[in-house]
């Protein structure tokens, strides 16, 4: 009887620990210093299995005017998700220009495409960003987190 009670208590504790850990494993939240970067789509070119979207916007944090090109590749059978690569060019009022390599994954729900991107800038800065593309409104909005 004593072993049965201990076994039951042990299984209950194990179940609670598992449920606690599984909830935190499924959640992915980024915290820390960040800034907003907002863009307007200037063109959208469709190809079989991919789309190329160009956009531009003014971004703080010393970036200035930013031009983006993203090539979205469809990798799912339903066409609702995939990966992307891209390039960014920035120029500030003083004429300093920077280049960036962009890469990540995306998923679409209705008119909204959610992007998760890792970017490498020529000045050595690396950023993680989560973005939302509104295909109907023609906008891109990112929360950018510099990586230390």
Model-found features: residue ranges?
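N-terminal secretory signal peptides that target proteins for export/translocation
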Residues: 1-7
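Beta-strand-enriched cores of mature, soluble protein domains
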Residues: 25-148
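Bacterial N-terminal signal peptides
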Residues: 10-22
